[in-house]
UniProtKB/Swiss-Prot annotation:
One of its GO terms (molecular function) is zinc ion binding. One of its GO terms (cellular component) is membrane. The record marks A658, E659 as: Cleavage. Belongs to the hantavirus envelope glycoprotein family. Disulfide bonds join C34-C159, C68-C165, C117-C136, C141-C146, C183-C193, C218-C257, C386-C445, C390-C399, C415-C434, C462-C485, C745-C780, C749-C787, C761-C894, C775-C905, C790-C913, C816-C825, C833-C842, C873-C877, C979-C1009, C1002-C1054, C1019-C1024, C1055-C1060, C1094-C1098. The chain crosses the membrane at residues 496-516, 638-658, 1115-1135. Residues 526-543, 598-615, 602-613, 621-635, 1131-1143, 1131-1148 are annotated as: Binding to the ribonucleoprotein. Gene3D superfamilies: 1.10.8.1320. Coiled coil: none annotated. Residues 24-495, 659-1114 are lumenal. This is Envelopment polyprotein. Keywords: Disulfide bond, Fusion of virus membrane with host endosomal membrane, Fusion of virus membrane with host membrane, Glycoprotein, Host endoplasmic reticulum, Host Golgi apparatus, Host membrane, Host mitochondrion, Host-virus interaction, Inhibition of host innate immune response by virus, Inhibition of host RLR pathway by virus, Inhibition of host TRAFs by virus, Membrane, Metal-binding, Phosphoprotein, Repeat, Signal, Transmembrane, Transmembrane helix, Viral attachment to host cell, Viral immunoevasion, Viral penetration into host cytoplasm, Virion, Virus entry into host cell, Zinc, Zinc-finger. PROSITE patterns: ITAM_2 (PS51056).
Amino acid sequence: MGELSPVCLYLLLQGLLLCNTGAARNLNELKMECPHTIRLGQGLVVGSVELPSLPIQQVETLKLESSCNFDLHTSTAGQQSFTKWTWEIKGDLAENTQASSTSFQTKSSEVNLRGLCLIPTLVVETAARMRKTIACYDLSCNQTVCQPTVYLMGPIQTCITTKSCLLSLGDQRIQVNYEKTYCVSGDLVEGICFNPIHTMALSQPSHTYDIMTMMVRCFLVIKKVTSGDSMKIEKNFETLVQKNGCTANNFQGYYICLIGSSSEPLYVPALDDYRSAEVLSRMAFAPHGEDHDIEKNAVSAMRIAGKVTGKVPSTESSDTVQGIAFSGSPLYTSTGVLTSKDDPVYIWAPGIIMEGNHSICEKKTLPLTWTGFISLPGEIEKTTQCTVFCTLAGPGADCEAYSETGIFNISSPTCLINRVQRFRGSEQQIKFVCQRVDMDITVYCNGMKKVILTKTLVIGQCIYTFTSIFSLIPGVAHSLAVELCVPGLHGWATMLLLLTFCFGWVLIPTITMILLKILIAFAYLCSKYNTDSKFRILIEKVKREYQKTMGSMVCEVCQYECETAKELESHRKSCSIGSCPYCLNPSEATTSALQAHFKVCKLRSRFQENLRKSLTVYEPMQGCYRTLSLFRYRSRFFVGLVWCVLLVHHLIVWAASAETQNLNAGWTDTAHGSRIIPMKTDLELDFSLQSSASYTYRRQLQNPANEQEKIPFHLQLSKQVIHAEIQHLGHWMDATFNLKTAFHCYGSCEKYAYPWQTAGCFIEKDYEYETGWGCNPPDCPGVGTGCTACGVYLDKLKSVGKVFKIVSLRYTRKVCIQLGTEQTCKTVDSNDCLITTSVKVCLIGTISKFQPSDTLLFLGPLQQGGLIFKQWCTTTCQFGDPGDIMSTPTGMKCPELNGSFRKKCAFATTPVCQFDGNTISGYKRMIATKDSFQSFNVTEPHISTSALEWIDPDSSLRDHINVIVSRDLSFQDLSETPCQIDLATASIDGAWGSGVGFNLVCTVSLTECSAFLTSIKACDAAMCYGSTTANLVRGQNTIHIVGKGGHSGSKFMCCHDTKCSSTGLVAAAPHLDRVTPYNQADSDKIFDDGAPECGMSCWFKKSGEWILGVLNGNWMVVAVLVVLLILSILLFTLCCPRRPSYRKEHKP
């Protein structure tokens, strides 16, 4: 057994894996969609799921069980008596008996079922108050299998208490997931949040509300009253279909319906609610429901045995119910209640479609559940902008987006958005991760483009790091870190400035000493090289002179070329006697012997050394080397002078490096004032402007004949607005394509009502009375009888988007000019101009991707953007075309289901229908090729019955603008502007720093004139960081200016030209714990007033303001810096003491 234990363990593990695989296959999801704001009295939330089929033998043992934490109502869990009504072929028929109307029979028996949707009176009505949830199921069966549909209804408060739990029905597990949508209180339809308000259609004009198609789930409730016919529901159906004379249908009850995913209960019938009348009429037309079968049975076949009657209950002496017996895929619900009995008699009829035609009087039933659709008026929830912030995390950033009314659309080209949602009250929050911070983070949220500057994230990390380093002095840690952590050259300049101020008295002599040592070594190497080279040149000159006067310098014996006369004389004396002229050792008096000895002789350089000693020794103490050696780098005067020069230099670099680069769109920091233009010629501007950008142009126009006469000129172009005259085509629908085969052996094709005949869109082809044996099963009667009915229909209709057709287009900009005291405004179209006596502003043309006759499709809120269709069918639409299925105010428009039927036959086999046309809806085709369509984004949309206006936030459109100002201006009249402007700073929020931004609130007073168009800037003492154009009116005006930039010492003032408010306000320091973005719409402003760039005086003014700001700010920072300066001076004094005998030590 010990040897077999590993095998047993292996088999056990395999069995567990197989069990887990089977469990996973039996897991189904039931999604409950909840609004994310739950208030009292908002009704019920409902959901359903269709489960896989199970053998009919298991139905009687089914039990719906729950492991959820909510309180389940027990009324549906008890056993209930049903009459099981089935059909079968008669057992006494001979083997080859052909099928006929008498070849089958029905049987009735009593069974007990539990958990079906038999909802007692007041259970649904009190569910919200009692905090009880209702779980039940319904059955759609043929002769062998049943397909359950599980329904879950509960008070909407369960969306708060439950996130996920499990239900079980037989061997099937149902994962119940409560998902909060981005809707505050409405249902999610077409990607938008829709609040159905049925009274709007009665009290308001049609253009003030929207109409949506929503699903309706209805459940039969039994309620008996002692007298009257008020609860006899069948009477209402008979009245609706104008059937008179029926007196036997005494069943009493009503349907309670839930609309969409959450709603208050709707009672059917109810005289005071037109929604109830609409549902009642749909029930009368489609008595079994408007949803015909499950999606996986979209292409299936059924065989009709014939009409049957039976006894319900089984103890009846005569038939009380009728229907159509079939085999094949199950269709509608197989449960119902008999209408002819006072007391409810429940029927379970597998394989039989029970009679539901209300135009007959007898043997009718009502289904226990009914599913359909209803069109309702209502309003679409307003959306708000998103707030996004990010924090640095590892190599990337952690970001979070939230909105007060939900996030319906969020995407980013640089981040991974995982759709993990949280809700705090009405706010919806989504967290996501951005893996890279080497580029700015762009997020599209609720139709707005948000940009987070990643350099601000790095600044935040820098602040955190420096704060940790200086944590021993927490009073100055953050203030010092904020000053140091500035991006780019500006930050390095700040750090060098502080290092120079604090440690300059130590760093300057240290760095100077190191540089001097390097220079001295280099000078010495250069001088040494010069000495050797000069000596070699001297020897060469001596050699040449000797050769000229005395002859050859070559020894005749050893053939060695000598360099001096003494060396040649020694060779002549020694070589001839066989002695070495250098070391005087004996050798042979031959050339080879002597040359071999010279190679090893150690005294060969004796004569060169003697010559070198006879020359004057070189003293490298003159010129550069001597100057460097005697440089007094430890002098207090030198160190102090360099320290002051470096401080001034660093302040200039610090101020100059604070300027931002010029941008096409956005603010460029400039000095105060505006540019002056002498009007010697006409002033002409010709440029291209992005559709999402506004443009401000401001100048002082000067009289060339008199420089004192100046006219203020202000031009303001607002963002481009697209005006589209539209035709509302309706709502585009998606649907499931169904192909059904209905075969019966005898009777004409008109004998039966086929399931697809109650669908909104269908076509049918009948193959009646077969003429051969090739299309008949073996039990059919043969040639000349029977029918194969082929049907194609569309169901499971779902509204997916709004559709508008562009009738005409206009592109406009509002143009305003202020020339002296004259102000003119006009909304200018393409190829239109604003013309005054002196100024002409023209919008010459627009580059656009929109054209009249284009069709716009919105798959969600307008702010989410849409798709442009160049071809959209409006009259003759085929299934699969864009716009194939449309829901319009006049009703449903069905497409042409083009294609031909073909009956597939085989000998002794039931025929099957085939369809060779398109089977994919236009919406599904569009989704598969969505990237091939042009898309567009929308900001600030405004829609009415026949018009749609919006701004393009992507700058995909451009306008050609031309501006001409005539030089013939009336300077005498226009230069004298009586308007007086006084400015005061009210408040400020936000932070200084180029990546954070601030909002300055100004109070501007206008006197002496009624209106004046001008620009108000946000400036400190040196520069301006933002501007806004304001049309001032007489009196007090509140102006908001958004700016970015500045430093810790900036006192932001409200300025007009060179006049500023008397006081300024200091913005907060950029803590940058959570970096928020700026709206791209706020940044798409082009401002050009020609103000001069910051020069030398501006730099000193900026540096001085910063120093004063530091002094007036956290005094502990200044104290610490001064202490460090004193310590560095003391250290310098100790390391570099003054030497009074310096001159004596260096006396020559």
